[in-house]
From Swiss-Prot:
Protein name per UniProt: tRNA (adenine(57)-N(1)/adenine(58)-N(1))-methyltransferase TrmI
The reaction(s) this protein catalyses: adenosine(57)/adenosine(58) in tRNA + 2 S-adenosyl-L-methionine = N(1)-methyladenosine(57)/N(1)-methyladenosine(58) in tRNA + 2 S-adenosyl-L-homocysteine + 2 H(+)
UniProt keyword annotation of Transferase present: yes
Recorded family membership: Belongs to the class I-like SAM-binding methyltransferase superfamily. TRM61 family.
One example GO MF annotation: tRNA (adenine(58)-N1)-methyltransferase activity
Alphabetic keyword roster: Methyltransferase, S-adenosyl-L-methionine, Transferase, tRNA processing
One GO cellular component term noted in the UniProt record for this chain: tRNA (m1A) methyltransferase complex
Record remark: domains: Contains a large catalytic C-terminal domain that binds S-adenosyl-L-methionine and a smaller N-terminal domain that may play a role in tRNA recognition. Domains are connected by a linker region.
Domain of life (superkingdom): Archaea
Function: Catalyzes the S-adenosyl-L-methionine-dependent formation of N(1)-methyladenine at position 58 (m1A58) in tRNA.
Chain sites annotated for binding S-adenosyl-L-methionine: 98-101, 119, 172, 188
Naturally occurring in which organism (per UniProt): Methanocaldococcus jannaschii (strain ATCC 43067 / DSM 2661 / JAL-1 / JCM 10045 / NBRC 100440) (Methanococcus jannaschii)
EC numbers on record: 2.1.1.219
Gene name linked to the record: trmI
Amino acid sequence: MFAYKLLVDERGKRYLLKKNVEKFGTDLGIVDMKDIEEGVELKSHKGHTFYLVEPTMFDILKRMKRTVTTLLPKDIGFIIARAGIREGETVVEAGTGSGALTMYLSNAVGKTGKVITYDIRPEFAKVARKNLLRVGAIKKGQKIIGLDEEFDDEDEIEIEDGLFNVIQKIGDVREKIDEKDVDVIVLDLPDPWNVVENAKKALNKKRGRIVTYLPYIEQVKKTVEKLKEEGFWDIHTYEIIEREIEISEKGVRPSTRMIGHTGYITVARVPPEPLDREEEKE
């Protein structure tokens, strides 16, 4: 499903490699991977142990090329779970950034779903395109809507079992959201309150949800006020803190390091259409 394979040495150090890499060298020696599929234990020419396995999206996210600070898995996972994003849904995202959240959204909606991701910066969209291509979220040669540019993907690995469910656009959702009957809108923008009215028009009134991700509480307050003004309901804001647990022969304890504040996640539902009983009688 991905254009990568993962090589892990006996110390736990990970190397994300393109599928077509046949040999790879580290301080522990050279590993020969020619004609070898993932799922095996290998020895370097120095006798050190390596595992060759398929990477997860988490492995790729940690090592992919970035143009901006990306959302972390702790926040991405919560967004998908709390918004209830599922197979077959249509999700609009803005902005794309490096494509980290886009990858996970693609995975969540599956082959029968669709992710339309907007960014106003062509240079960011092009970096994201490369990342999305290598996880099978878009096809080779696929264009970015709104960008008059052809892409030469000849050197990229063909992914036959990709999801191919992402559409990239250059556009400003503050001005317009082209899509209608959208299930979920996810906004990673500094001023989502300027998008709320357009989001309200685009969302499916039966099940539409909106998610915003913001670093500052003042931004959250302004966003929530606008959501309420536009009739959005079931509004909740969260902060996710991550701390790993260390397990050793001595005992079990929380790690002294933790991932604290990264951003605030606000989730809300679009207001349903009011039912006019008089019109119903007529």
